Regions:
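Acidic (Asp/Glu) carboxylate-rich active-site/surface patches
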Residues: 1-76, 80, 86-91, 95-156
Length: 156
C-alpha cells in the first residue's frame, strides 16, 4: 500500500503551481481529506487571482504597446499623490519602464496597499529606464489651484 503524502507535503507541492490544468491538481482532486480539498480551493483561487492580475496588466500595457508600435520607444507612466493645500504638497512621479517590464502588480498607487507599494518600489527603481519626481508646495497650490499645481509638478 502506498503511503499518502502529508497535507504539509501537498501544500509544498501546490505552492509552485500556476496553471489550472496542472496534473497535481487533478491528482489531488479525489483526495477526500478536508485539508487537501481546502488547499486545492486556495490554489485555484490563487491561480485565478494571478490570471486576473495578468489580464489587468495586459490591459494597462495596451496604451504603451500602441505607442511603441508607432515608434515611440519611451513612454512615461505618471502618478500623483497629495491632498492639496491643507494636507501638504502634491507630489508626482514619472517612470519610464523597459518594454519587457513584467511586474504585473504595478498599478495606480492609490489602489495598492502601503505594504505592496513598499515591496514593489525597489523592483520598479531597479528596472526603470528613467524616474522623475516633481513637487508643488501648498503655497503654489494656493496660488494656482490643485489641478494646475499637479500639472506643473508633472512637468518638472
Amino acid at each position: 500500500m502506498e503511503k499518502q503524502l502529508t497535507i504539509k507535503g501537498i501544500k509544498s507541492q501546490l505552492a509552485a503551481i500556476s496553471q489550472e490544468n496542472d496534473p497535481l491538481l487533478i491528482l489531488y482532486k479525489d483526495d477526500r481529506r478536508v485539508g487537501v480539498q481546502k488547499l486545492l480551493k486556495q490554489t485555484y483561487k490563487k491561480i485565478q487571482q494571478h490570471q486576473l492580475l495578468v489580464a489587468q496588466f495586459q490591459q494597462r500595457l495596451a496604451l504603451e504597446k500602441e505607442a511603441w508600435s508607432q515608434g515611440l520607444n519611451f513612454v512615461a507612466g505618471i502618478d500623483e499623490v497629495g491632498r492639496g493645500c491643507l494636507a501638504g504638497p502634491v507630489i508626482t512621479a514619472a517612470v519610464i519602464l523597459p518594454h519587457d517590464f513584467s511586474v504585473i502588480e504595478v498599478n495606480d498607487s492609490k489602489q495598492l496597499s502601503r505594504h505592496t507599494r513598499e515591496r514593489l518600489y525597489p523592483q520598479i527603481i531597479e528596472q526603470a529606464l528613467a524616474v522623475s519626481i516633481g513637487v508643488s508646495s501648498p503655497s503654489v497650490i494656493d496660488q494656482i489651484n490643485i489641478l494646475q499645481a499637479t500639472r506643473q509638478s508633472m512637468k518638472k
